[in-house]
Amino acid sequence: MSLLTQIFGSRNQRLLKQYQKTVREINALEPALEQLSDEALKAKTPEFKERLAKGEDIDKLLPEAFAVCREASKRILKMRHFDVQLIGGMALHYGKIAEMGTGEGKTLMATLPAYLNALAAKGVHVVTVNDYLAQRDAEWMSTLYGWLGLTTGINLSQIDHEAKQTAYNADITYGTNNEFGFDYLRDNMVYDTGDRVQRGLHYAIVDEVDSILIDEARTPLIISGQAENHTDLYHKINEVPPLLSLQIGEETPDGKGKIEVPGDYTKDEKSHQVLLTEAGHEKAEQILTRMGLLPEGASLYDAANITLIHHLYAALRAHTLYHKDQHYVVQNGEVVIVDEFTGRLMTGRRWSEGLHQAVEAKEHVKIQNENQTLASITFQNYFRMYSKLSGMTGTADTEAYEFQEIYKLETVVIPPNRPSQRKDRQDQVYKSSDEKYGAMLKDIQDCYERGQPVLVGTTSIENSELLSGILTKAKLPHNVLNAKQHAREAEIIAQAGRPKAITIATNMAGRGTDIVLGGNVAKQVQIIEANDALSDADKAAQAQKLREEWQSLHDHVVNAGGLHIIGTERHESRRVDNQLRGRSGRQGDPGSSRFYLSLDDALLRIFAGDRVRAIMDRLKMPEGEPIEAGIVSRSIESAQRKVEARNFDIRKQLLEYDDVANDQRKVIYQQRNELLETTDVSEMITSLRQGVFSDLFRTYVPEQSMEEQWDLPGLDAVLRDEWKLDFSLAKVLEAEPTITDEEMLERLLKFTDDVYAEKIEIVGKEAFAGFERSVMLQAVDSHWREHLAALDHLRQGIHLRGYAQKNPKQEYKREAFELFGQMLNLIKDEVVKIVMTVRIQSREEIDAAEEQLSQSHVENVHYQHADFDADAAPEELLAPTAVASEANQTQVNALPKVGRNDPCPCGSGKKYKQCHGRLA
């Protein structure tokens, strides 16, 4: 501890001291509030709302609001917030993370800042890890909020659209992180503002914040669906690879080297890559032109042909790198992948990027539709959009640096209401897994005989089943949880504190439910009270009997030493180990914990195995004897720190790459929202039209060029064939030989204005405006989807730029910016082309066209929170594939509005109006 810390206290101590002053203010208000009638106490809510509306600072309202919420809780829930819960509530209100031990009442604590911030009428989101906890907490606390005059909503995955809108319009909304995220993305895919469900991202309280913002930060949400059908294209492209030859290296006559025999493509089986040579490009372009797939004189690398080259490379890989009965088999008319490591069939799995469809075309079986990412976001970027973010958990301090670095969230460690009596014993390390499990069995048997409940934490379902088999063989009754059935697991966890209870749980199972020593009597009392067959007197008598029995069981467990925690191996994160330990010793209860390890455990084997084995050999440890020493524990902790640091780097790198897409996402979503809220887009269309035709004109009539350099016949042909415009600039020049290029451009723009005006006259301005808006939305959506796929392809190979002495991140940022600019140009061209070439005779036709455009062109939409393996491919982790996700939409004003003259958020240094703002 430094001298300054000794004198002034740590940052945490200073904050707690500051909060204690406010606690004294809140406590001073309690006697007066106790004297108020229920009606007078309820009247405080509208009074607070009125004061906020008149401009009073919400922070100044905190002591009174917290005091009112606590008094209401005493009357309604029969629970009074402890002083430490008031401190935790303050930390949450000020946008910090409150670390509170298990059983300290985080759910009740969250009611304080939720009530205070809901008074602003902008919505409060309480985020949990699963639907069961969201529903449980919402139903439990809605009685309190309702009594105080606030509404509560529950945002579950299975509810319908109207129910979602109702949930979000409530003052306080409970839901899961996945559902909030998916709703955000869905809201940015609607074609009518009335279809949105979210109303803005004002304030979020994230429960189990370490699990959501750290453990799940590497696994973005994805909305995907089946893209448009390219079956014919796959079949046609499939004819190209057999016409191309492989470039090979033949030995020189002296046998000392190799010379390249020219060919059309090269292949690298090690990296599973195939590349066209210069000659191969030309040959492929000629073949595709003959097939009618590539326009005469066009290049495969033109922006318009990005899909074509993608399909061509997929077909080449299918023909040259993927072989039947080695990489896949054809079974019942389907291509089934073979696992290259185990040789097993991977039914249901499909290669991505169109490769699977290319193999299906090669084998002449039915081609399944390609999946396409529709929208994506990471939790890191979603939660950072809230105006104010806070979180609570039992274990955050070990990750405090990451919370501060990534989310700008400070961690405040809240002291327990009663000091912990849990005894954390030294780890015991055995040479083999068999010895370790044998020692664990003895420990469990000893606890069982003494009536002490045991919770065994495992790192995987496989280990849970292994241990369950050992206990079954030893005839020890037990329960197994593996984090799948949330409602049932909460029930089992609630009774895991009964005498002789043995519960095996994977690390995450049962989080959010307290283990009460002696069992959870409240659950059993609820069942009795819900039994209509019993009279009130019988209910009261049975409930009293249950409570007396519980007291006896509780005392028995306390005398036996409280809940005993056994860890079967160390997790790579100290935080997860601390979560397991934290299940015991709640609210000052006694308890104990111990980890049993072996040199076969993954963490020890990789990081500390040799060192510990050397110590055991030197000490000549007999079979079955453990080593229990500080040096071993320190080695393990050091290993965990290394893994944590590596995982932090991975998440930080992921965020740096995703920030590029995030900046572009903000621009697209902001412009899309502006489109949705604009009834008349004719000015925007006019601006786009003039830009497109000016660019087209300058392609054939360059600025400051001589008349001899003009290609007016070529321009006339394009206007006639592509744009269906009966207008000849060659004839204009012939009639007026002295006309300038600027004047000709004006004539062209005037003609396009007249054509546009005629279309509006036929169907009416209002009807045509609706059609134009639908055209723009459809163009933005389809090109944004293709752009996401292009970013995905770019990111997958960007780490290879490092071999060329280039910075992959800078290259990714530069190329992503170029792709974004190309996408905006494609959107402009498509919108103008559709609006100018559409042939309409009546209003009915235009209404039908608008309806068709508003329908999604993507079917079978899927929502997924993709699994991510940190150890799968270290190189790719630093330039990871884009994983998409679904997330809720923010209100337009929830994203910072970019002014036309402000710097563009893409980082180019240009003004927004000259960069990504040019679409608008």
Curated annotation (Swiss-Prot):
This is Protein translocase subunit SecA. The keyword Transport applies. Keywords: ATP-binding, Cell inner membrane, Cell membrane, Cytoplasm, Membrane, Metal-binding, Nucleotide-binding, Protein transport, Translocase, Translocation, Transport, Zinc. GO terms for biological process: intracellular protein transmembrane transport; protein import; protein targeting; protein transport by the Sec complex. Pfam families: P-loop_SecA (PF21090), SEC-C (PF02810), SecA_DEAD (PF07517), SecA_PP_bind (PF01043), SecA_SW (PF07516). Its main location: membrane. The gene is secA. Its cofactor is Zn(2+). GO terms for molecular function: ATP binding; metal ion binding; protein-exporting ATPase activity. ATP binds at residues 85, 103-107, 514. Signal peptide: none annotated. The keyword Translocase applies. Part of the Sec protein translocase complex. Interacts with the SecYEG preprotein conducting channel. Has a central role in coupling the hydrolysis of ATP to the transfer of proteins into and across the cell membrane, serving both as a receptor for the preprotein-SecB complex and as an ATP-driven molecular motor driving the stepwise translocation of polypeptide chains across the membrane. The lineage of its organism: Bacteria, Pseudomonadati, Pseudomonadota, Betaproteobacteria, Burkholderiales. Its EC number is 7.4.2.8. PROSITE patterns: SECA, SECA_MOTOR_DEAD. It is a peripheral membrane protein. It is found in: Cell inner membrane; Cytoplasm. It comes from Janthinobacterium sp. (strain Marseille).
